[in-house]
């Protein structure tokens, strides 16, 4: 391997962004990851819940992003801290169709934020995805739920922390392009 090859590989690695996808079980994390992937890499045979973690790489606007899809089952949550080393972004996925789980998901996020070794919001950009918008038929109810979550997030995070909020559907793909854009922008914010 020549020196130029080594330099090129290092430049690619330097541009690589590590992004964790976290949230409660069945919030649609794996489905969102699947939609973020190029069409020829998407799984169209049905998405299974993640046990442990899965890593996928994709290129968005000349930036290589390593997506770490971490399982959200209650038994896996205590291990989430172990994944934050060298992480530039976190996507926190909320199932907006199940308002009865808002308290649980916000409590888990609060506990994660309060462990300051993660540096969430400072060294690690935060994107909160309100997923499954396609399952809330009443658009005024969807708007109300989004405002509720946004209000709660403002209470969780310090005012100097920038949070991106994205509404999408991992199934229909609505909002996925916006998520791609926010992901790249957030990663530049932390560099």
Curated annotation (Swiss-Prot):
- SMART domains xrefs: ARF (SM00177), SAR (SM00178)
Residues the entry annotates as binding GTP: 23-30, 69-73, 131-134
Q: Which SUPFAM superfamilies match?
A: P-loop containing nucleoside triphosphate hydrolases
Which GO biological process annotations does it have?
protein folding; tubulin complex assembly
* One Pfam assignment: Arf
The alphabetical list of record keywords is:
GTP-binding, Nucleotide-binding
User: PROSITE patterns from the entry?
Assistant: ARF
Stored InterPro entries:
ARL2/3, P-loop_NTPase, Small_GTP-bd, Small_GTPase_ARF/SAR
Which Gene3D superfamilies does this entry report, sorted A to Z? P-loop containing nucleotide triphosphate hydrolases
List GO molecular-function terms, semicolon-separated: GTP binding; GTPase activity
Keyword GTP-binding in record: yes
Name any GO cellular component annotation: microtubule cytoskeleton
Anything else known: Present with 468 molecules/cell in log phase SD medium.
PANTHER family from the entry?
ADP-RIBOSYLATION FACTOR-LIKE PROTEIN 2-RELATED
- What NCBIfam families would the database entry show? small_GTP
Functionally, this protein is described as follows: Implicated in yeast microtubule function.
Protein name per UniProt = GTP-binding protein CIN4
Q: Which organism is it from?
A: Saccharomyces cerevisiae (strain ATCC 204508 / S288c)
**Highest classification ranks of the organism:** Eukaryota, Fungi, Dikarya, Ascomycota, Saccharomycotina
